[in-house]
Swiss-Prot record:
Full protein name: GTPase Obg
Domain Obg residues, every copy: 1-159
EC code: 3.6.5.-
Family to which the UniProt record says this protein belongs: Belongs to the TRAFAC class OBG-HflX-like GTPase superfamily. OBG GTPase family.
Species, as recorded: Cyanothece sp. (strain PCC 7425 / ATCC 29141)
Compartment(s) of residence: Cytoplasm
PANTHER family: DEVELOPMENTALLY REGULATED GTP-BINDING PROTEIN-RELATED, MITOCHONDRIAL RIBOSOME-ASSOCIATED GTPASE 2
Positions bound to Mg(2+): 173, 193
GO molecular function, one term: GTP binding
Cross-referenced Pfam families: GTP1_OBG, MMR_HSR1
Primary role: An essential GTPase which binds GTP, GDP and possibly (p)ppGpp with moderate affinity, with high nucleotide exchange rates and a fairly low GTP hydrolysis rate. Plays a role in control of the cell cycle, stress response, ribosome biogenesis and in those bacteria that undergo differentiation, in morphogenesis control.
Amino acid sequence: MQFIDQAEIQVRAGKGGDGIVAFRREKYVPAGGPAGGNGGPGGSVILRVNPQLQTLLDFHYTQLFKAEDGQRGGPKNMTGAAGNDRIIEVPAGTMVYDTETGALLGDLTDANQTLLVAKGGKGGLGNKFFLSNHNRAPDYALPGLEGEERSLRLELKLLAEVGIIGLPNAGKSTLISVLSAARPKIADYPFTTLVPNLGVVRPPNGDGVVFADIPGLIAGAHQGIGLGHDFLRHIERTRLLIHLIDSTAEDPLRDYVTIQTELEAYGHGLSDRPQIVVLNKIDALLPEDLTDLQARLQSEIHTPVFAISAIARTGLDALLHQIWQELEQLDLATEDASYPGSGAIEGLTPGLLSRGVVE
């Protein structure tokens, strides 16, 4: 299954049923009054979050979604049946835009959250509605109204609290695989990870925290170079970034600056997101070389630098302890510890991701 995080679809609500012209025709009422029923309302198109979905792949096979039309009215003042709504299931984290205007219609983050994107047309009025003192036998009715139709752009942004970033081959996939039960593809060449991977890690006391291994970024990523900004958007909802650096690289400091530059150029506050800087692959360094490198980095970037070997599983306890501390401080700093940018918009009635959980 492909990881698809963008799609365009067309939605069309149902037309309202027509009202009808009818009169009472009973045995002892040969000239009864008007009795034409109203048409039923057309069905609406509604998006609904299915937390089991992880991709927008299905929308690349089906682009047009239509709700049912309402039924025409009936005699004896019977209202026509309403058209059935069309429910479209989307993954959590789906942002919905009006293609024509670019307006954000909704940000769907919660299980079973819904968003009305095309309202069904009203049913037409039957001739009974037009009965008055001046017209005791109206012989006209109104047709149903057309339902709303619009083009939508869907954009999936992963719901992860902790994002693992770094240049290709920094060891991001290895790290998420040892911290969680996720099993991403791992190999010794750049861009092994071509899709984001999710893993759930449980702190000593608390619910699981979702980590996302974001595919390797390179210089110019914000302009679409390499894997490009297609995956930078998935960092936007994170609360904390783990900036992973290959300690065996030619110039680890330059690698750090490269990623920071891309975050700043992309915008959306990514460069200001809380970060934990981590040197990986320290099992390949001599102790004195590691000490020198760690000290040089800390003096240049003015922040603590953690040292780990994901493959040897060393230094992970200290790193996790720091992660839990950072998240706890973020919780205390805000009354609402939800993902940045999540929530409904006021006034408006993805190969497969790897997932794992570890205790």
